[in-house]
């Protein structure tokens, strides 16, 4: 019998399954607006994911990227992770809505009792996304309503919720602005990050309760989680890279004492918080850039 570790009720366990995204959203926190490459296959990290399923009890799980629908292995992630947490209710795939023409993929996600979190980043995408959602759900007996949500920028917006047998199946949100990310500037193809007070930056981070699993290992946050992907494919200033390379991670096969200590400190600030801004300023995402920035 494995020891079970419980995350706080507000926390998200985020499985990052691809660096690739088809959009160019400025200030994307995981830098997927750049020419990022590589998808991850569930089979490569299956053992670690299954071990997390044995020892970790998260209140919420989100499969994300990048754009998860761009990963040809998405459904293997959906089915595989659902087997790891067969009874979890708040379990979603987060998408920008531009791949919803893949009706059978969406139905397969819904049939695994995950819900689809559609986060639109350009008003011009709305009509087509809604049409694809309604086509996807046409084979089910569904109901829908509208609520008011708040995103990580504290902006309020309408959420269109679709339910099957009382269970959330799709949420359509208009997220047309992002807050600042860890980029202070890009100069001569080098990404320079902030030098903030880490405590203040952490307190003001809207994603501080989103903990990332990347290549099967657990990280404090999105930036520490993607740091190897980022520094392998792009040039980051030397001071920031050095700090990122010191990021802690937790392998599910680590000694139980190490896992307990790591999870117990998940909600605390880390030295890498200094790389994010102390204050986040909202910026409209649209019109989206026509091509990804080459740096």
Q: What are the functions of these language-model segments?
A:
Residues 1-95, 100-105, 112:
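Conserved alpha-helical substructure of the radical SAM core
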Residues 9, 40-44, 73, 128, ...:
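Soluble or luminal CAZymes and related metallo-dependent hydrolases
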Residues 10-12, 113, 207-208, 270:
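Extracellular structured ligand-interaction cores
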Residues 16-20, 29-30, 120-122, 216, ...:
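Short loop/turn segments at strand-loop or loop-helix junctions that form parts
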Residues 35-36, 70-72, 101-102, 124-128, ...:
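Short catalytic/ligand-binding loop motif for oxyanion handling, primarily in non-cytosolic enzymes
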């Amino acid at each position: 019998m494995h020891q079970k570790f419980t995350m706080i009720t507000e926390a998200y366990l985020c499985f990052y399954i691809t660096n690739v995204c088809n959009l160019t959203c400025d200030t994307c926190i995981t830098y997927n607006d750049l020419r990022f490459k590589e998808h991850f296959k569930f089979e490569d990290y299956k053992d670690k994911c299954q071990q997390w399923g044995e020892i970790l009890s998260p209140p919420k799980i989100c499969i994300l990227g990048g754009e998860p629908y761009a990963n040809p292995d998405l459904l293997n992630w959906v089915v595989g992770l659902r087997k790891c947490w067969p009874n979890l209710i708040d379990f979603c795939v987060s998408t920008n809505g531009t791949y919803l023409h893949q009706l059978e993929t969406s139905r397969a996600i819904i049939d695994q009792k995950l819900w689809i979190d559609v986060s639109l980043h350009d008003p011009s995408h709305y009509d087509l996304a809604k049409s694809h959602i309604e086509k996807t759900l046409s084979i089910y007996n569904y109901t829908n309503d509208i609520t008011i949500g708040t995103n990580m920028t504290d902006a309020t917006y309408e959420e269109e919720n679709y339910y099957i047998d009382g269970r959330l199946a799709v949420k359509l949100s208009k997220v047309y602005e992002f807050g600042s990310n860890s980029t202070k500037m890009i100069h001569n193809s080098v990404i320079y990050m902030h030098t903030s007070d880490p405590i203040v930056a952490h307190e003001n981070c809207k994603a501080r309760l989103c903990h990332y699993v990347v290549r099967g290992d657990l990280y404090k946050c999105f930036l520490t989680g993607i740091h190897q992907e980022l520094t392998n494919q792009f040039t980051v200033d030397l001071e920031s890279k050095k700090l990122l390379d010191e990021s802690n991670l937790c392998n599910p096969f680590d000694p139980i004492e190490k896992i307990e200590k790591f999870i117990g400190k998940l909600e605390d600030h880390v030295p890498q918080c200094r790389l994010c801004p102390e204050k986040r300023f909202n910026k409209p995402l649209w019109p989206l850039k026509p091509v990804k920035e080459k740096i």
